[in-house]
């Protein structure tokens, strides 16, 4: 889109806010502040008049502009409209960020920042990197805030093609596992009544791509998007899960499910910063999987030393349904079976074994209970002698019930972490719970793998012991879904992986063409070639990565197994030599 000053002045008169400006005579009340990216290619113009808005440009092309920015409080106060500027200042920053267990050992973040504070007790920070832009609200001078809405809208003049991950929670889109393939659709084709979770990709003109996502999500709900054509253009509007007013506890796993919602999206301290809204920009598709804005905008490390946090591969039980063969003991969730997994891990240099769902009786919903078929202390001792570490699966809400007790007990026993599952929400109470889990686990030197989880939001910078995240349509789907995962697997690295690592759970050894593939729960197969499964260990970011198939199968294919186990899981640097979205 080329900028026409007259057109934009007319837009200003009609909508009482300026989306973008390159020239013309304006009223004195309109204030325009601009910053450029360090390489000079991007420019962000922030406009304050009756409302606060911004636009992001690349040369004379408007990439995106905003709807009016505001926070609406429960008492009716709206922070944004008619705000009076107290101070506006720009800074140039270069910082080196250690990034353990990430796709590179450190990040050099270079950006220009515009910080506008207002007399009404709030402000907005805008940051512009070579790789994109971000903004966040902050508030001051209040004891507490009850927020009922945040106005966050991303406006495009054209009906661009987008890669949309719809929430699959059709009855309640706020309750979902953040797993879906991408629907390729123009903004105007967004399905009515649905919401999309982040990240979401927009294909702009001239091969430019933009990924919308967020970072530093703490004590606040995650953002969903709703696409529609409005009088302002083609818009993705932010939607936020309210705080649940009523819940029910699912009887089998103890998962807490909302049954009603309040009008408030966040009850929080009055002096704080809010999540960064990110617009990551690429000229080449290969720039997207190594865009570091989400990590760089996360809150700094709160764990101190990270030397004790070890990445590695995992021999996993659940996907293959404990399906080992040729043994002289009953196969199942028992001590003998897990010793077999430990022996396999030790023989192949695999660092971890996960004890997935079933080691603790589900009916009790008590993480301190263990089924009689398993002796945990015996397994920890056995694994330790073979230089293998053990990780326990659990439901997040069940762990939270006895968090301090469980972390202390299992850490002292010798376990190295938890695979935490079935959150399936990103409202404020769940986000706060996950920070609580991560902090407590870190104090007891336990790593965390968040399954059933929303996308990474810089969490792994703040708590590096959180080493992996699901929020991905991973290989477990092949147990029950007919979806074609082969195209998906060459799309999501450019979108979801921009946000951070993926607990994809790869390594299926029974491989089938699309024609022959069909879901099998107990003895699943993987669509595509064996080489494709091996390649995922290089292409996908997985500091804690599963070998999902059973040890018996891997031992029959030792050449493939040995190749997989030699591939590193943490890197000093990541470079993408060639690639294209969807290919």
Q: What do these predicted ranges mean?
A:
Residues 2-13:
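Bacterial N-terminal signal peptides that target proteins for export
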Residues 11-23:
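Bacterial N-terminal signal peptides
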Residues 24-28:
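Sec/Tat signal peptide C-region and signal peptidase I cleavage site
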Residues 30-296, 301:
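N-terminal accessory beta-strand-rich subdomains and adjacent acidic, glycine-rich linkers
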Residues 137, 345, 421, 448, ...:
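Conserved, mostly hydrophobic/aromatic
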Residues 265-344, 348:
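An acidic-aromatic substrate-binding cleft motif
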Residues 549-583:
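Glycan-recognition and catalytic regions of carbohydrate-active enzymes
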């Amino acid at each position: 889109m080329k900028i026409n000053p007259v057109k934009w002045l007319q837009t200003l008169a009609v909508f009482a806010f300026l989306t973008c400006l390159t020239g013309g005579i304006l009223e004195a009340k309109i204030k325009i502040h601009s910053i450029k990216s360090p390489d000079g290619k991007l420019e962000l113009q922030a406009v304050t008049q009756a409302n606060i808005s911004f636009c992001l440009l690349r040369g004379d092309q408007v990439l995106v502009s905003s709807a009016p920015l505001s926070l609406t409080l429960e008492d009716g106060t709206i922070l944004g409209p008619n705000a009076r500027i107290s101070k506006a200042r720009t800074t140039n920053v270069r910082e080196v960020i250690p990034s353990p267990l990430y796709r590179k050992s450190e990040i050099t973040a270079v950006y220009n920042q515009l910080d506008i504070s207002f007399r009404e007790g709030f402000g907005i920070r805008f940051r512009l990197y070579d790789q994109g832009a971000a903004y966040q609200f902050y508030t001051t001078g209040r004891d507490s805030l009850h927020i009922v809405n945040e106005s966050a809208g991303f406006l495009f003049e054209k009906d661009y093609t987008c890669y949309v991950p719809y929430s699959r929670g059709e009855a309640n889109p706020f309750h979902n596992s953040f797993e879906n393939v991408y629907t390729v659709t123009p903004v105007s084709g967004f399905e009515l009544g649905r919401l999309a979770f982040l990240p979401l990709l927009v294909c702009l003109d001239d091969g430019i791509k933009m990924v919308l996502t967020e970072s530093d999500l703490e004590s606040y709900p995650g953002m969903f998007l709703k696409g529609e054509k409005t009088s302002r253009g083609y818009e993705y509007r932010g939607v936020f899960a309210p705080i649940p007013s009523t819940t029910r506890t699912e009887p089998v796993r103890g998962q807490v499910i909302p049954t009603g919602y309040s009008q408030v999206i966040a009850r929080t301290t009055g002096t704080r910063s809010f999540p960064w809204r990110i617009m990551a920009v690429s000229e080449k598709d290969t720039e997207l999987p190594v865009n570091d804005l989400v990590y760089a905008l996360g809150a700094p490390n709160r764990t101190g030393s990270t030397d004790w946090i070890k990445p590695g591969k995992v021999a996993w039980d659940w996907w293959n349904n404990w399906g080992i063969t040729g043994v002289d003991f009953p196969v199942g969730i028992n001590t003998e079976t897990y010793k077999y997994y430990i022996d396999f891990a030790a023989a192949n240099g695999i660092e971890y074994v996960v004890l997935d769902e079933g080691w603790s009786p589900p009916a009790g919903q008590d993480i301190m209970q263990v089924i009689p078929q398993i002796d945990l202390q015996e397994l920890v001792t056995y694994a330790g002698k073979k230089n293998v570490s053990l990780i326990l699966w659990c439901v997040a809400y069940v762990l939270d019930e006895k968090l301090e007790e469980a972390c202390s007990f299992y850490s002292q026993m010798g376990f190295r972490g938890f695979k935490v599952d079935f959150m399936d929400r990103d409202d404020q109470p769940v986000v706060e719970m996950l920070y609580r889990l991560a902090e407590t686990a870190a104090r007891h030197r336990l790593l965390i793998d968040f399954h059933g989880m929303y996308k990474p939001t810089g969490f792994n910078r703040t708590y590096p012991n959180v080493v992996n995240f699901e929020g991905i349509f991973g290989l477990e789907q092949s147990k029950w879904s007919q979806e074609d995962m082969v195209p998906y697997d060459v799309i999501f690295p450019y979108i979801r992986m921009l946000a951070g690592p993926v607990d994809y759970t790869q390594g299926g050894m029974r491989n089938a063409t699309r024609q022959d593939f069909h879901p099998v729960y107990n003895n699943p197969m993987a669509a595509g070639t064996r080489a494709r499964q091996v390649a995922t260990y290089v292409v996908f970011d997985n500091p804690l990565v599963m070998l999902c198939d059973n040890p018996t199968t891997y031992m029959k294919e030792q050449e493939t197994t040995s190749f997989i186990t030699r591939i590193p899981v943490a890197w000093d640097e990541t470079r993408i030599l060639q690639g294209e979205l969807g290919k």
